[in-house]
């Protein structure tokens, strides 16, 4: 499943990078926004189908009754967190394609090291929560990153072109973004 969503992220970053590099910054921003909405919706749909069909699907692997229950609930947990995770992943890839490699990477590593890993460890080792509760803590940094990165995506500050045409279009793009911000305020 991860390879499929990685492919969507790569395709999104290519589309965004091509537009930003060509100086079509508004179109690059539009593609990134669309990808950050459509790809998580695809993730949600696929995981929902898998959750609904978990019995026939996972019975192919000869899992016992207890394992089947766990896979069902793990899919339900991932139904929510997977969509959020895909959104964050897509945003990060689009940031990189738009010339911003630092913000998404720092948020990803920082979220894991300072939020998810400690929270998961505390949930499992200190609080002795059941496995499924501990499993859900693995994805907690995704919520934090979603809340921080989504406004960053929408503001377009991550667009930092590396090419001549992209750089030439940057000042006008920033002016348009400021005007949009003033109209929205």
Regions inferred by a protein language model and the residue ranges of each:
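Alpha-helical transmembrane segments of multi-pass membrane proteins
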Residues: 1, 65-91
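Small-residue-rich hydrophobic transmembrane alpha-helices
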Residues: 1-54, 86-107
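Alpha-helical transmembrane segments of multipass membrane proteins
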Residues: 2, 42, 46, 50, ...
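Residue-level recognition of transmembrane alpha-helices
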Residues: 39, 75-78, 82, 108-109, ...
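Membrane-interface helix-loop junctions in multi-pass transport and translocation proteins
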Residues: 54, 60-62, 68-69, 102, ...
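Intrinsic disorder in cytosolic terminal tails and internal cytosolic loops
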Residues: 159-185
């Amino acid at each position: 499943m991860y390879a499929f969503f990685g492919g969507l992220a790569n395709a999104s970053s290519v589309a965004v990078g091509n537009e930003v590099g060509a100086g079509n910054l508004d179109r690059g921003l539009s593609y990134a926004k669309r990808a950050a909405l459509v790809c998580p919706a695809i993730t949600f749909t696929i995981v929902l189908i898998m959750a609904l069909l978990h019995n026939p699907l996972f019975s192919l692997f000869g899992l016992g009754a207890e394992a089947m229950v766990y896979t069902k609930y793990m899919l339900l947990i991932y139904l929510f967190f997977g969509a959020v995770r895909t959104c964050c992943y897509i945003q990060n890839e689009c940031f990189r394609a738009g010339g911003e490699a630092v913000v998404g990477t720092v948020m990803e590593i920082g979220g894991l090291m300072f939020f998810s890993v400690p929270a998961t460890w505390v949930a499992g080792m200190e609080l002795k929560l059941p496995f499924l509760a501990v499993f859900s803590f693995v994805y907690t940094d995704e919520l934090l990153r979603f809340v921080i990165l989504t406004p960053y995506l929408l503001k377009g500050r991550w667009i930092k072109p590396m090419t001549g045409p992209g750089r030439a279009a940057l000042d006008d793009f920033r002016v348009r973004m400021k005007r949009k911000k003033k109209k929205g305020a």
